[in-house]
Amino acid sequence: MEPVIKINQGETKWDVRHKVWNYIEVKNLANFPRPVHNRIPNFKGALEACNKVAQLEIFIESAVVKVDPDKPMEGVRLAALKARKSLLVPTPRLRFGLFNRITPPKGATKETLRVCSTSQGIKEFSVPVGLDDKVQVDLVVVGSVAVSEKGYRIGKGEGFADMEYAMMACMGSVTESTWVITVVHDCQVMDIPEELIERHDLMVDFIITATRVIKTECKHPKPQGIIWSMLHKEELKKIPILKKLRTLEQEAGKDVALKLIHAGEDEYRKSKELQWQSHPKADLEFKCLASNSDRCSGFEPKFPTTTVYLSDIPPALRVSELKGLLREQEVVPLQIRWQGAKRKAFLLYADFTGAERATAILQKLFINGHTIQAKCVSSQKM
């Protein structure tokens, strides 16, 4: 089947992600949640694809299955529970461990199992699995934004699937005999250039769509463990289990040296910090926006800001949806001045760098059939 999404020479992984997200949105190929940007798309036909996974011999023969918690893999989780397999899901953002095991209550009905397979069920019916439990995983099922028939995979950009697999390899939970499957829409299968693939990226053995079962025969190795030299110490603070794994590997005599910030990069970072020091009121406005308040009461910003002007906003888009989108894209402004009736809005940022980054990201978004127009306006004193 000829790929419907083409990757041009010189395009980055983020270019590919935006192409896929925009294509799925404009073609209306996804179910809730929408928009699909910054998500593993819950594509139409996901249940049919999951049913194909359940029919695979490697699924039937697996005793322990690790499945991502994203919505399109819900059918695989349900199939695993119905087949009485040991079902593992990643701990959210790896904050408190690596795995949770879904444990349905005794005498669970089909409806209870269905609930257990959902995001709500994962919260209510799961227990953490510790590093000492020595889990052996037979099959890994991951979501993807884009994949190739060669087994190359591009996720949503946070790196958790890659990190989870590397951590499992570090723990001895996966081996060369562990299969990796991804469940996607046909449009997500494309020719991914090899130069976009890095050594920490997770490869897939099977691609399952609603219409196809593709065995990739991937030649690239999967991660064999954590590449400590690619991690900063800040990442260990965010993911505590990494500290434990690093200690274990260090005790085993392995090289666990972390990535060092280059002197030039450090000087550049310091110079940027000197150019703009965070204002207490800016931090307060940021928190107010994050808690769904349009603006903080009692004051207007009294420091230099740069405005991003949005036009051609979809008529049905609500300000709450825009806020959610800005959070997902990690371009939260100090303040939003909403003029939905006129299909425009003004986003206030603390400095030109933040505004410029937001403009570049927002210009690529395709929401509800519309491309939002974003333009950076010169700094002003508010």
From Swiss-Prot:
GO molecular function, one term: RNA binding
Keyword RNA-binding annotated: yes
Entry-linked SUPFAM superfamilies: NagB/RpiA/CoA transferase-like, RNA-binding domain, RBD
Record-linked InterPro entries: FTHF_cligase (IPR002698), FTHF_cligase-like_sf (IPR024185), MTHFSD_RRM (IPR034359), NagB/RpiA_transferase-like (IPR037171), Nucleotide-bd_a/b_plait_sf (IPR012677), RBD_domain_sf (IPR035979)
CDD domains: RRM_MTHFSD (cd12270)
Record keywords: RNA-binding
RRM domain ranges (all copies): 306-382
Domain of life, source organism: Eukaryota
UniProt keyword Iron-sulfur present: no
GO cellular component: cytoplasm
Designated name of the protein: Methenyltetrahydrofolate synthase domain-containing protein
